[in-house]
Amino acid sequence: MTAHLSGDIEQTAAAERAVAKGENPKRPHVLVAQHSLFDPIRAPEGKHSLWTYCHVPNGSTFDMTDRIETQIERFAPGFRDRILAKSAMSPARLEKYNPNNIGGDISGGVQEMRQLFTRPVPRIVPYSTPLRGLYICSASTPPGGGVHGMCGHHAALAALRRDMRQ
């Protein structure tokens, strides 16, 4: 589960307008997830991890950590006092870490219909490949980035349907 923190619609729109103008938003629209609630190996016993991000201009090197923490603190007072450790990555560092994150885009790049059904080659079932038993799933397959888990779900169903017929 992912929670979105930004305030009312005007505050959300202002944050996204700033990014569109090439500015780092003062009050970003923040997405947070606490994966350790569902996967206990992500944090020591009795502790939790929090994963978060916000939109910034393409290629930004500005550290948004303080602004993100300030937004979370608005909705969860005392949050900062509970932080034991933190790590942040700029878009440039994200791209260096994973070349698929072009410009730091964690959604796998532009989502265009013609691309979604031609990766890696044109196919009716975009998760299958010409190689038997090889399927792909990621933010670069339908329904695209931001629909957490659905790319893998659909790829698994495609694999089961195809493999069960053979």
What are these regions (language model features)?
Residues 11-29, 60-99:
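Flavin-binding catalytic cores
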Residues 91-92, 160-166:
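Active-site-proximal substrate-binding core of FAD-dependent oxidoreductases
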Residues 137-160:
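A conserved FAD-binding loop/helix module that cradles the flavin
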Residues 56-61, 140-143:
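A generic structural motif
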Residues 1-43:
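Mid-domain catalytic core of redox enzymes
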Residues 27-31, 78-142:
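A glycine-rich dinucleotide-binding beta-alpha-beta segment and adjacent secondary-structure elements
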